[in-house]
Structures are given as structure tokens and as C-alpha cells.
Design a protein with these regions (language model features):
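Scaffold/interface architecture of coatomer-like assemblies
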Residues: 11-306
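Bacterial N-terminal signal peptides
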Residues: 1-9
């Protein structure tokens, strides 16, 4: 298993070194009883268990101290085409606010296929410009497909849009935090992979999922069974990867961006050497607790040892 060790010397920036040992990395955030993010914890304030067995923390740090690798995953299927377009300036402002000098992000758009519209860039302005071009609907077939090509005429490949970038866009040499922000209603009808595979891919590659959900009601403004299922899917994906599920239709994209930015700036990362054998192909449950009562920890629920 690849793990990331953070080394720092007095006043110097931290450096990430990836080594082949049985270490597990976990990004997590903590909230108090009022829902406010807690950003002042130390290694001595938290405990971690794997499958109920206490683990020794070998690394603890603030996520803001390491580079951010961010993926923007945009649903451009028929029901979602009007979702992000009016908020491109808000998206650009969010990226400018959340991305520091060493941070970088990529852009993927998906409907029946998953396509890389912009590879990693340190400029939020460039990413939004690429999205504007993709929104025009011209030349989309020229964007490279992420993952194996699938023959699909119509449909929405929501699960593939998480599974493929989680596996392919965050390589072993990628330093720092890993996150995907998914803009969608969570509905899927043409993926080659299923929901559990998408969650497993994110957990295995230390990717946190932030879901900005926009649900277009059915006829007469009623919420359909498909709407409800998509809502539950996005909530589960965010919960099991330690991220955030946000109803952007009800509360607005600006507020969603604010909450995601706050969590990214206030989260932590820890590492421990697992007592379980590497590559046993079983699911190992992770639990992080704070010694202070009344705090809620959001982290991935576990991982499959590969």
C-alpha cells in the first residue's frame, strides 16, 4: 500500500515522501456540537481504530499544509445542463479562494461517457474557461475518454465519473490531499461500474468526495423515486469517503462552495501502520474518535486492502 509521510524541519515547508509500507492514510474533519469546524486539534486529541483494534498514529498534520489535488466532475447530461452555467463566476471565485500556489485541479465532464476536458492546472480561471468551451457542446467528442471506451448512445454514467478519475487521476506520485467535487443529481443509467465500486475506488485512493446536488423535479414539480434514489446515493458516497453532501438547489451553489472551502481548509490527515496483512482483499473498518466529548468526526469508513 502506498503511504504518504510528511517531514518538516524548523520553518521549512513540509515535504511528502511516498514509500511502499503498510501504512493507511486518512483525511478527516471534526465538528463541534453546533456543527462548527474544529481546526485546533493535535495528535494527542484523537484515537484511531481499524476493525476495532487501536492503531498507533505515525503521522498527524493539518491538510492545509500539504498540496491539494482537486477534480471537478461535471454532469452535463440533459437534466443538468442548466445547473452550473449561471454560476461560472462563483466557481472561478471558489477556485481562486481555495487553491494555493502548489495546488492543482482538473476538470471532467460526463453524460454517457466520461471525458477529460482539462488536465491538471494551477489556474482556476483556465479551468472555468475550459468548462465554458465544453458548455458550448461543440467538439466534445475530441476530449479524451477517461477509462476504457464504452459504446453508449444515451444515458448518464455517474458511477463511472467517480470510479475512473479516482483510479486514474491520483497516481502514487501525487503528493498531498485528494478530493473530487461532483456536480450532479446522482442518477445513473449507463455506467460500467456500480455504486459500491465507485466508493471503493475513492476509499482505496484516499479521495474525499464532495457532492453538490441539484435535483430537477418530475412533472408537476413532484420529487420522483429516481430523484430520491439519486439523493441517497450522493449522501452515501460523501458519507463513506468523509466528504460533504450539499443540496445546492435548496441552498445555492455559493453556500455549497463556502462549506466545501471551509472543510478543505480545516481538515486533518493522519497515518498509521495497519496491523492487518496487506493485500488480503477484505474491507477494514476505520473509526476516528476525539477525546473531547460532543465532537463529530467525518472520515472514510474504511478501505479494501488491495
Amino acid at each position: 500500500m502506498l503511504a504518504c509521510l510528511m517531514l518538516a524541519g524548523g520553518g521549512q515547508a513540509q515535504t511528502a515522501i511516498r514509500v511502499e509500507v503498510s501504512l493507511v492514510n486518512v483525511a478527516f474533519s471534526v465538528r463541534d456540537a453546533r456543527g462548527n469546524l474544529v481546526a485546533s486539534l493535535t495528535r494527542d486529541d484523537v484515537e484511531v481504530t481499524e476493525d476495532g483494534v487501536p492503531q498507533k498514529i505515525t503521522f498527524f498534520g493539518r491538510s492545509a499544509d500539504v498540496p491539494l489535488n482537486l477534480g471537478l466532475i461535471m454532469d452535463v447530461s440533459g437534466s443538468q445542463q442548466s445547473f452550473v452555467k449561471p454560476h461560472l463566476k462563483d466557481l472561478e471565485a471558489f477556485l481562486k479562494n481555495v487553491m494555493a500556489s502548489e495546488d492543482r485541479a482538473f476538470l471532467i465532464c460526463f453524460a454517457n461517457r466520461v471525458r477529460l476536458v482539462s488536465d491538471y492546472s494551477g489556474s482556476g480561471k483556465e479551468l472555468v474557461a475550459a468548462l465554458r468551451e465544453a458548455e458550448k457542446g461543440k467538439g466534445n467528442a475530441e476530449y479524451p475518454i477517461v477509462g476504457p471506451p464504452e459504446y453508449r448512445i444515451l444515458g448518464t454514467a455517474f458511477y463511472d465519473a467517480i470510479y475512473e478519475p479516482a483510479n486514474l487521476m491520483f497516481t502514487g506520485s501525487t503528493r498531498g490531499r485528494r478530493a473530487l467535487i461532483v456536480f450532479s443529481d446522482g442518477e445513473d443509467n449507463s455506467s460500467a461500474h456500480h455504486m459500491l465500486e465507485a466508493i471503493e475506488a475513492a476509499q482505496a485512493n484516499d479521495v474525499t468526495l464532495f457532492c453538490l446536488r441539484y435535483t430537477e423535479p418530475g412533472r408537476n414539480g413532484r420529487v420522483t423515486a429516481r430523484n430520491k434514489y439519486g439523493t441517497s446515493v450522493m449522501a452515501r458516497i460523501a458519507r463513506e469517503t468523509g466528504g460533504l453532501d450539499f443540496d445546492a438547489q435548496a441552498h445555492g451553489l455559493q453556500e455549497g462552495f463556502r462549506q466545501i472551502g471551509a472543510q478543505l481548509r480545516s481538515s486533518y490527515e493522519l497515518g498509521y501502520q495497519t496491523s492487518n496483512p496487506s493485500g488480503d482483499k477484505t474491507f477494514h473498518k476505520i473509526a476516528i474518535r476525539t477525546k473531547q466529548p460532543g465532537f463529530e468526526v467525518r472520515a472514510k469508513t474504511g478501505y479494501y486492502s488491495r
